[in-house]
Regions:
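Hydrophobic, well-structured mid-protein blocks that either form specific transmembrane helices
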Residues: 111-143
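Short internal beta-strands
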Residues: 33-39
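Histidine-anchored nucleotide/phosphate-binding helix
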Residues: 19-28
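S-adenosyl-L-methionine/SAH cofactor-binding core of RNA-modifying enzymes
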Residues: 46-123
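Short, glycine-rich nucleotide/cofactor-binding loops
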Residues: 7-19
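Short beta->alpha connector loops at strand-helix junctions that form conserved
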Residues: 11, 37, 82, 135-143
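Single conserved hydrophobic/aromatic residue that forms the stacking wall/gate
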Residues: 144-154
Length: 154
């Protein structure tokens, strides 16, 4: 069976607690592939483990990279998340279009990644232009939508 589980990529996360919270949410939806790009407080981080509520399997397998280019070089479909309207060249999709594209892509053997920016500022335009698409996820539905590709059967 094809592995359709996405990678969650946190670019320049600022607090270990937010990494732990992300891992906890990922575990709740069966997503275990977490990558960090240049975490401000370094990795590993005790604060992440303290708040992760048992998501050690996610935290223990985190991959850390210095640059976004390094952390996404094997990702064949990168979807950047943003709350702002962007005028840079990346095509915006609604969440349902993004899920469908991600599912189709993984069924054809591709690796997908959802890219999230720093807590305080979000993704820079330089980060966004490296993505294939952008999406804006309604806050109260974000975890449901990100887990959607893992619910599909091939």
């Amino acid at each position: 069976m094809t592995d359709i589980t996405p990678y969650i990529i946190l670019s320049k996360p600022q607090l270990g607690e937010n990494i732990g919270s992300t891992a906890r949410a990922m575990k709740n939806f069966g997503i275990e592939k977490l990558r960090l790009i240049s975490p401000r407080d370094g990795w590993p981080n005790d604060s992440a483990y303290a708040i992760s509520a048992g998501a050690d399997n996610v935290l223990n397998n985190i991959e850390v990279f210095s640059t976004l280019e390094q952390g996404t070089q094997d990702i064949s479909l990168l979807i950047a998340t943003t709350a702002r309207k962007r005028v840079v060249g990346t095509k915006p999709l609604n969440i349902f279009e993004a899920v469908e594209k991600a599912f189709e892509h993984t069924m054809n053997g591709g690796k997908i990644g959802f890219l999230f920016g720093p807590e305080q500022s979000g993704l820079s335009n330089d980060d966004v232009v490296q993505a294939d698409f952008t999406i804006s996820i309604p806050l109260n539905l974000s975890l449901i939508h990100i887990s959607e590709p893992t619910r599909r059967e091939g």
